[in-house]
Amino acid sequence: MRVAIIGMGTAGVSVLRELVKHPKFNQLDIDLYDDKVNMGQGVPFQNDSSELLINMPSKKMSLNLDDETEFWKWYKQQTDFNFDEPAYLPRFVFGHYMKSYLSMFTKKYPNISTNYNKVQEIYTNSNIDETNLTYYICTTNSGQSWQAYDYVFLTCGTFAYHDPYNLKGKKGYIATPYPTYNTLDEVNELDDIAIIGTGLASLDVVRYVAAHHPKLPITMTSRSAHLPSVRGTMIDVTFKYLTKDKLNDIKKHHFGNAPLDTLVSLFLKECAEYDIDFKKLVHRRTGNHIADLKYDLARPTEMGIFQSMIEHLKENLNWIWNSLSIEDQHQFNQKYSKMIQLNSNPMPPRTAELIIELIENKSLILKKDLEDVKHDGKLYYFSYKNQESVDIYNVVINATGAKSHLNELDQDDQLIKNLENRQIVQAHPMGGIQIIPEANQVISPRFGTLTNMIAIGQMTNGVNKLRNGVKMIVEQVAHTVSQLYDALESNEQQQRSDNQ
């Protein structure tokens, strides 16, 4: 069986790790596709400044669901990197951990090949009425260079960043913040810099720019200007009310769906079990960034339990989210998505302490109520609600986060646009592409369920709601890779039957 893995970041490497475990792995011919920069590391963990920290404790990050300390053990055994404060390691170190496994596998198994070209096209040229599809992968726009595959994993990573003010291509606009050590390449020492976005990506930019750009302060701005929370001391959590059995029982009485209000009530009962006042903590922010960060820093136990509850909710959100009606999914997005995002994926305490220091010494300005950004060919003009004058900058760094809907994509995500145009994938109303929940099999508007095409990661965000962390991606992989070997066994049985 010929297998293609398209994208070799967290999801792609995890797929390969699962595949090699099977006794029939040697019956596969596997081609890995990515460029030389991202092969084995992916964009989030690419080589970058050591100031960019993983937002999870090093001892809690792993591609191994059975050993959450695997990354930490790898770090302690290797000799290339050594850091004074390894509790939160630089992000690129995790990339090298992933890449070490890819290197080991490609050396050990002769049936793995690497292709350092970006995939431009995926198509199927099946006969009419034929449902057993072969997929053709091209690394050129002309379609002259292609390879045929029986099974495809779409592990392409996140979509490109939003461009909310249509600034892409303008001088002084940096459309993506990564790698951060390139953000200042074309910036003059006296340039005033603004960062659009106040999430984790913007904090990465601040860490780097504040350390390397002489003209301060930097301005970080968005509509709300909410910062992520600060990571506390995480604990293991088990739900006793919001469970699959309970949800299945609820669905029996509500036409196959579970009412959102009922599920929220069950989650609040879970919080009460751990003595967490969920509503108080959700609304704890005062708008004073220093006070809010210090609040979190002073309560590592309470914040850690609170964050652990949200993290456990996210880990189980696939079956919760997909039990909701469309109407309730819209309600969830309006009322709870932002709330969860603000309180999950917290920043390391070290980052919070740096942000406080930068604000206090006037090296960083945080502003809310951003309404518009204009460019006159030379400068950028930021307008704010309830502010008559505009703020003027030479350079704008975009840290708004990745797009989520297919209708937002442009040439930066041309492969996905081509797949949609050829009716191999279709848009999910809540974001990303349509897949079968749990199985992650792509649903095509032309061919129906593509049992031999698996999509994993942010491109499935309409089904795998808010489940784009490393552990959640690895869990998706673990649930789906066995399907390939089921298909291989089915093919072998069919061949035996045909030969009789």
Language-model segments: residues:
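Active-site-adjacent segment of FAD-dependent monooxygenases/related oxidoreductases
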Residues: 43-90
